[in-house]
Amino acid sequence: MSRFRSLLQASVNATKKALTWNVEEWVPPAEKHIFKFHSKEDLKKWHLYSDSEYGGLSSASLEIPDKGDGSDCTGVFSGNLSVDLSEGSKWNISRSGFCGMRSKKFDGFIDLDGYDAIALRIRGDGRCYISTIYTENWVNSPGQSEDNSWQAFVFAPKDSWYTAKIPLARYLPTWRGNVIDVEMEMNPGRVLGMSLSVNAEGGAVGAKSGAGDFRVEIDWIKALRLP
């Protein structure tokens, strides 16, 4: 074989290899585990917050209960929502009755480029919870918050395991829990963290609302590519 034909064949082979590499490398798996809640080590990646930090009386916990029957362990986010305020509180908050769990800061980012939805496997109490995604700002500037927050409601059916699938397009930009009217696009390649929260005001029509106890079991959180 001449040197020219050898070079041509090598070029063709390299092109075929590059095309194969592109297909395999650029299309992400159908699903991607983000967080799981199967051990106490898994729960150490999260911290709790509530209105008690601002004079409220709500409380929350995140635990792995010992089932004792050999079944798989799952995290339980539970507590009590109160719309009352501590007597003599120095804080002037407009509303109380909320609790949440947020992933702790970590080095790097969660890359959700190529995915269409967030999925949570949960078993709840009939309340509506709030799923939040925190992303890095597209452009950071002085005086600007270090991240953007995007929120969507997720219903937790009572006493039944349910996989909630929330398209990323359904997450709306928010500021301090309120939807803001601004044209923004999520930066899915630079996710800084996530949270799950609940408030006494409820959410979806027909969902349980008001002050009182709440409880939701969480198995895992994944990113999905939808068909």
Swiss-Prot record:
Major localisation: mitochondrion
An example Gene Ontology CC term for this record: mitochondrion
Keywords attached to this entry: Chaperone, Mitochondrion
Domain of life: Eukaryota
Cellular location(s): Mitochondrion
InterPro entries: Galactose-bd-like_sf, NADH-UbQ_OxRdtase-assoc_prot30, NDUFAF1
Known role: Chaperone protein involved in the assembly of the mitochondrial NADH:ubiquinone oxidoreductase complex (complex I).
Assigned protein family: Belongs to the CIA30 family.
Protein's recorded name: Probable complex I intermediate-associated protein 30
